[in-house]
């Protein structure tokens, strides 16, 4: 699986959330919880994945094909999201 992103969006994410897209592959190598993001009509299928990055739970918005995961944003999970993640992976 290859990872890609828009460089301007990556820089914006670093400024806004303090998290770089580089290294997010780590999240997808561990236990994850992924849901379809149906909040808006994005014109493409988008997913929200929760997983561990450097020991903390993060939320990644992304698209996915058979070969590529395109990262849209990464942020630290809220307390509720963190609780939901640990509950889901324990089941």
Regions found by a protein language model. Name each.
Residues 1-91:
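Ribonuclease/tRNase effector modules and their secretory precursors
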